[in-house]
Amino acid sequence: MVIHKNSIIHQDAKISSNVEIGPYVVIGPNVKISENVIVHSHVNISGDTTIGDGCKIFPFASIGNDPQDLKYKGEKTKLIIGKHNIIREYVTINPGTDGGGGITRIGNNCLFMISSHIAHDCKIGNNVIIANNVPIGGHGIIEDDVIIGGNAAVHQFARVGKMAMIGGMTGVTTDVIPYGLSLGNRNYLEGINLIGLRRKNIPNKYILELTSAYKEIFKTNNLNENLNELNGEFKDNTLVNDIIEFINKDKKRPICTPFIK
């Protein structure tokens, strides 16, 4: 363990071996940091915060400080960050609130670029990339393998399905389906995230079926009727099933649909 002499670490904080902590870091009493974590200078970590193995936290990040929610009155809530995440300069990640289940949860192998913000009660999956200056509003759900471009913004309670891609400067006010490509302010569906699917080596057969199903699902604004008309046509395609399940889940925001020109 290497802790710079100019850092302030509360005696009750649980710091594992093989952790490196740079100068002018402040760590509170209820913080738990796992093995092989690197905390660069001028980082503040507070609250009931758990940080998993191998994370790297860069200068001026603020982790676990009180939620930006006027209803929050100091309740004991949590922030749980998984393994091997990279948290760049000026990133802010807030813990949960009683109104949202009390936990903000970050998965594994994510990249949070400079000045991105994860608000209270968010659920971030694995292998997510959130680019510079992107705020995720409270209670937001970002599933696995999502990429969100710079200066986009995600509305509170909005969901972004797995392997979706959000273009830079997009205002996400509606739920984006798995494998979707969403652009614009306010956001609309541009189509399927073909680049992301090919990067994951998804067989072309499944991509073609997904594209056909996408056209059927969004051929009119009546999604329920369109889903019923599929009548199990793509029941063996897990990609299509992911979209159907996503649309049918309980939701706070409407589903993002294609732009009607």
Identify what each model region corresponds to:
Residues 2-188:
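Structural signal for interior beta-strand "rungs" in well-ordered beta-sheet cores
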Residues 1-6, 11-12, 17-18, 54, ...:
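Terminal amphipathic alpha-helical/low-complexity segments used for targeting or macromolecular assembly
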